[in-house]
């Protein structure tokens, strides 16, 4: 009787341990799809451009409205970068400017690399 009880307890212990491990793997691999589906319903901006168009059309600006940041500036090359913490603004000299990723370079390194690329040296 004691050996049957011991075998039953050991079997139950092994079953619950295996079930816990499989639930872990299900969450890691199969459960991720359920998480993605449920997170798609909460507060995400729709993939169409209607929100941007409405905001752009509703903005009041007597000079130039920057398309990337919706900032109102005097001339197009004065538009700020959308992500100034990670982008560096570089004026091209022809009345236009670009924002390029800093990429962890030291200050001014992005501008130097852009100039080298414009000259065909990079």
Swiss-Prot record:
Keyword field: Signal
Span of the signal peptide: 1-20
A biological process term (GO) from this entry: ERAD pathway
Transmembrane segments: none
Functional description taken from the UniProt entry: Probable component of the endoplasmic reticulum-associated degradation (ERAD) pathway.
Protein family per UniProt: Belongs to the LCL2 family.
UniProt-recorded name of the protein: Long chronological lifespan protein 2
Organism phylogeny: Eukaryota, Fungi, Dikarya, Ascomycota, Pezizomycotina
């Amino acid at each position: 009787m004691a050996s049957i009880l011991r075998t039953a307890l050991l079997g139950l212990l092994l079953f619950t341990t295996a079930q816990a491990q499989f639930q872990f793997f299900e969450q890691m691999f199969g459960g991720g799809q359920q998480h993605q589906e449920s997170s798609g319903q909460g507060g995400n901006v729709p993939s169409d451009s209607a929100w941007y168009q409405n905001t752009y059309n509703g903005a009041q600006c007597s000079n130039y409205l920057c398309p990337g940041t919706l900032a109102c500036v005097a001339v197009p090359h004065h538009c700020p970068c959308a992500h100034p913490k990670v982008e560096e603004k570089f004026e091209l000299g022809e009345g236009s400017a670009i924002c390029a990723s800093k990429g962890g370079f030291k200050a001014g390194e992005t501008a130097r690399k852009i100039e080298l690329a414009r000259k065909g040296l990079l």
